Amino acid sequence: MQKQQVKKVAVTWRKRYLILLYIGIIIFGLMACNSKSGIEKTKSLGSDSTAAENKIDLTKIKIGYCTPSLNAPFYVVLSQYIKKNAEGFGMKFVSADGQDDIIKQITSIEDLIAAGVNVLIVNPLDHKAMVPAVNAAVKSGVPVFIVDSYIDPTANYITSIQANNEGNGELIGEWIVNKMGKTKIKAALISGSQGNPVGKEKRLGFIRGFSEMQLMSQGNVDLTIVSQGWGNWTNNGGLKAMEDILVANPDINLLVAENDAMGMGALKAINEAGKAAGITIVGFDGQKEAYELIKEGKFGATALNSPEELGRLVVNAVVKYLNGERQIDKVIYTPAVLITKDNVDKYYDPKAIF
């Protein structure tokens, strides 16, 4: 594991900058509602929960899936659910691992096309770099579906199935204001990988949700982000990033991790430093182990990004397309859901694989 880079960033909210920020939020953002535990937010660009009705023989269809990596539990489980749903319709399933490398993911897509897949599902490592590979697949006659992320609109894809990452971030930000009150926030971020659009959506949603809630409830915004580490979406990456953060900023009182795995790794570093009582930890994805930590009072909150639901929805869209349906939303979002100690029992399943 490469040594984690820690980028110090000071976010100082001055009055004039706050006004500009808030105007920008109103214009470009999704307006947030007051959050309560378990509140859901949806985007207007479509959500499709209806089961696909299959009227054709799919047993000769080979569906290919290219994941950006298998280094995080989320990616592993998402691949498993896509496989389960595809095989449930009788389709053959093949997959390829991009191994956290853009060139490798591009060649993996090419390999899947060469292997004769009829349909391709891609979770892009980079939303711009994957465009030529996706368009080449479509040109060869293979329709492409995007899952768990988005791709540049110049790509010729059928639909993108993704979590409402900005909405999840907003819910996390609102919860922090309600939880920490007028405590002066000194926060650190642990992000996944540089340039990843999903991580960016989460942290911008967090800043927006925090700003709107604190402005509404306290009349001002006071948030300082003193450090950003990179954990590559892994438990060990979160541990290493947090160790570096604590050396430079031992007095932080909030950690926002862009997935639960990194947050749990960071918790280990926080415990080893003897600072668990003074730092609130929040994450994203809704991993089973994070739910357990919430129940134990060691994790503040997480936001739901269900690999099970993503796997179901993307295969649903594939089946509808193969059955001739063309009125498929260009983007399909799963709802944003906040999980805290108040509603964790509703979502926690000790037998869940994620």
Regions found by a protein language model. Give the residues of each.
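Bacterial N-terminal signal peptides
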Residues: 20-29
